[in-house]
């Protein structure tokens, strides 16, 4: 203890003079025994006595949530449990304008590896009720270390508060269950990325790591409430090689708690353990997700273009229609509707020196690139004012790739060729994403495509995680995410979309922190096509911003009860809640359908910045049944919209309780398509229930705007 005090007091004392009061109302203070990070909404305090760090207070939403000082984190290193009070020595706490950086050194013992450091940066933004904590483990020494489990953040609060855990998975190609909700009353440890604790007021924890058995949320008998990772629960990811229920491509560790997997911290390297969000809320349980998404969408999620896109995969796929001559009429039709980005899916690349892995234009499909590496089709799109999007499988290559022939050492060994032998897969082999030379090459490919072809959006597909020699697939995942972030830094105005139609890629929050997610290829498992699209949005909202979900617009849906212009009025409002992407031959739309679609696109482009960041879920039933209503409320501070959808069943009129309204203000509610005003309501009336009428197989978009001052 004396040695620990000798180490921590000098740096903490020096930091006392470095306290910063930001003009934007975030305050970070540090002295010899305490650290505080707060704003006008929320505050968190830590004790630093003796080099041990404990969270002593979490104040917000009208109360104090910490019931006893508690460890800030737990981490199992080489089989030895450690916490912020055991096994580590605090080196320093450094205040920033909106943050505190805690630096720890692993305490020296006979068995502990030397030179291990843990850095935890806690960020609080102006007006936010959410603390964002990012943990990085650094090995400055000569020996590796194994990390089998850890918490990303934790606090001790009332042990008997009601709790709700939510676990997410992608994989719409094989399954429909993307969100799993578990209500808990006592101690528990569940798979999950979201944990809400409390009733009308409470706290929440969210993990930015992807879904999987290793992602954990829980609470012990003392009230220690946490979000973290337990790698020992995970065994293997089959990727596209296994798609059968109930486990699909997951293989949990059958020997747990005996570990099969752990993260390996290599000498002179670091591991990004992940980011967690701890926040407080009040005003009802629905306000928890609203508080999170306001912070996440405003600061973490990149400000990519929420453009209206078309993607060529449906209906042309890999066929002859995927060509310059066939697609020019689609460009003209898209331009007339107001579509902004034209994305060429798989098969724009090809030919000698152009296959997947080489990433050059197929001269048979898109001629003209022989001279300047830019096909005539790209010039034609520029002339029409259309942006270009390109599909890529950045981590996989065709066996005919000349790049692979020149650099076979870039392939993932020993499993790099396995998927190429699978008749159910795309016949692609796998690069080693952790290879620095390959990383530089792929970054160069993206640089070239942006420079030569003005690519505005990439869709990255086939991101199976694999073990490569001495790197496991968690290393592989982190290497890929790191590459995409480097691409974003180089090209901040380019959108990077990840395909999440297979499970265990990056969904939900790791993917959303990068950009939109292509979520659904239209594979049905007993439901109608429209019901599945509604279900996709229902599964994401309210915690995952639905604007990040990419779905096929008019993909076999403008038929039957959704035919004609009325079908457009029922379907395009759903597209506006998502990353709107047409999957259809636009030249087949009738004149009435084209006119109605163009009206909605123009309205969306004029108002899309008003959708959110919070999106409340107004109906509880899963619309996958094809009968239930589904309704959402995008809300941007004091105003927003109601999107209501009715399928085959349900009443003609439903009462939808709105959230986020000021009960003492007056609001005008209007139909955005007709311009008709439904009425003027007090906020208290809207909170009690707004009556909304929708015909069967129909939709309605209502504007909710405040009138005058409060």
Predicted regions and their residues:
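Secretory targeting and sorting signals
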Residues: 1-17
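Polysaccharide-binding surfaces and accessory modules of carbohydrate-active proteins
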Residues: 20-38, 42, 54-238, 666, ...
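Carbohydrate-binding surface patches
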Residues: 41, 213-217, 622-663, 701-703
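Aromatic-lined carbohydrate-binding/catalytic grooves of carbohydrate-active enzymes
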Residues: 41, 306-444, 451-460, 466
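Conserved, mostly hydrophobic/aromatic
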Residues: 41, 135, 268, 381, ...
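Short Pro-Gly-centered flexible turn/kink motifs
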Residues: 263-282, 642, 696-705
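Glycan-recognition surfaces
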Residues: 405-440, 444, 482-588
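C-terminal beta-strand-rich structural cap/linker in extracellular carbohydrate-active enzymes
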Residues: 679-710
């Amino acid at each position: 203890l004396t040695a620990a005090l000798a180490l921590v007091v000098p740096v903490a004392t020096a930091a006392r003079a470095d306290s910063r009061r930001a003009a934007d109302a975030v305050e970070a203070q540090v002295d010899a025994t305490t650290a505080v990070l707060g704003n006008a909404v929320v505050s968190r305090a830590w004790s630093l006595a003796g080099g041990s760090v404990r969270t002593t207070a979490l104040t917000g939403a009208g109360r104090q949530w910490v019931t006893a000082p508690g460890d800030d984190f737990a981490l199992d290193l080489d089989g030895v449990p450690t916490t912020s009070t055991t096994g580590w020595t605090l080196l320093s706490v450094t205040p920033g304008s909106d943050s505190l950086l805690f630096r720890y050194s692993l305490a020296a013992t006979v068995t502990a590896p030397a030179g291990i450091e843990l850095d935890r940066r806690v960020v609080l933004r102006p007006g936010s009720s959410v603390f964002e904590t990012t943990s990085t483990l650094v090995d400055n020494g000569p020996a590796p270390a194994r990390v089998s489990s850890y918490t990303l953040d934790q606090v001790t609060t009332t042990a008997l508060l009601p709790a709700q855990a939510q676990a997410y998975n992608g994989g719409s190609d094989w399954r429909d269950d993307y969100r799993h909700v578990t209500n808990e009353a006592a101690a528990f440890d569940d798979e999950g990325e979201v944990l809400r604790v409390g009733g009308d007021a409470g706290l929440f924890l969210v993990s930015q790591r992807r879904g999987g058995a290793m992602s954990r949320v829980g609470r012990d008998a003392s009230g220690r409430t946490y979000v973290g990772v337990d790698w020992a629960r995970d065994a293997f990811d089959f990727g596209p090689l296994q798609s059968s229920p109930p486990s699909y491509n997951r293989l949990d560790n059958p020997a747990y708690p005996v570990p099969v997997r752990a993260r390996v911290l290599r000498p002179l390297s670091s591991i990004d353990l992940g980011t967690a969000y701890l926040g407080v809320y009040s005003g009802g349980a629905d306000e928890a997700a609203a508080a999170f998404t306001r912070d996440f969408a405003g600061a973490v999620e990149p400000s990519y273009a929420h453009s209206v896109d078309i993607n060529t995969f449906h209906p042309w796929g890999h066929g002859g229609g995927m060509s310059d001559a066939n697609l020019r009429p689609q460009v003209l039709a898209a331009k007339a509707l107001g579509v902004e980005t034209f994305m060429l899916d798989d098969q724009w690349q090809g030919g000698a020196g152009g296959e997947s892995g080489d990433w050059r234009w197929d001269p048979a499909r898109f001629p003209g690139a022989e001279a300047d590496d830019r096909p005539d089709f790209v010039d034609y799109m520029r002339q029409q004012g259309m942006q270009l999007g390109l599909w890529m499988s950045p981590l996989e290559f065709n066996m005919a790739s000349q790049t692979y022939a020149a650099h076979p050492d870039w392939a993932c060994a020993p499993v790099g060729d396995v998927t190429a032998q699978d008749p159910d897969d795309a016949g692609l082999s796998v690069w080693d994403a952790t290879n620095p030379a390959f990383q530089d090459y792929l970054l160069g490919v993206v640089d070239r495509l942006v420079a030569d072809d003005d690519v505005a959006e990439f869709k990255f597909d086939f991101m199976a995680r694999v073990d490569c020699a001495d790197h496991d697939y968690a290393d592989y995942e982190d290497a890929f995410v790191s590459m995409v972030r480097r691409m974003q830094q180089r090209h901040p105005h380019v959108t990077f979309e990840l395909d999440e139609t297979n499970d265990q890629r990056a969904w939900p929050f790791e993917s959303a922190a990068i950009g939109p997610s292509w979520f659904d290829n239209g594979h049905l498992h007993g439901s109608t096509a429209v019901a599945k699209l509604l279900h996709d949005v229902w599964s994401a909202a309210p915690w995952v911003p639905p604007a990040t979900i990419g779905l096929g617009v008019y993909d076999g849906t403008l038929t039957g009860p959704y035919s004609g212009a009325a079908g457009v009025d029922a379907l395009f409002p759903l597209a506006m809640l998502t990353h709107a992407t047409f999957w259809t031959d636009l030249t087949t739309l009738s004149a009435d359908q084209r006119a109605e679609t163009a009206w909605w696109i123009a309205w969306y482009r004029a108002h899309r910045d008003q959708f959110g960041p919070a999106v409340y879920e107004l109906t509880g039933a899963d619309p996958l049944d094809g009968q239930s209503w589904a309704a959402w409320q995008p809300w941007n501070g004091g105003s927003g919209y109601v999107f209501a959808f009715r399928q085959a069943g349900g009443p003609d009129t439903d009462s939808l309780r709105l959230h986020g309204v000021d009960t003492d203000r007056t609001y005008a509610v209007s139909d955005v398509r007709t311009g008709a005003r439904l009425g003027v309501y007090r906020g208290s009336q809207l909170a009690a229930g707004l009556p909304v009428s929708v015909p069967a197989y129909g939709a309605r978009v209502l504007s909710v705007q405040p009138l005058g001052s409060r």
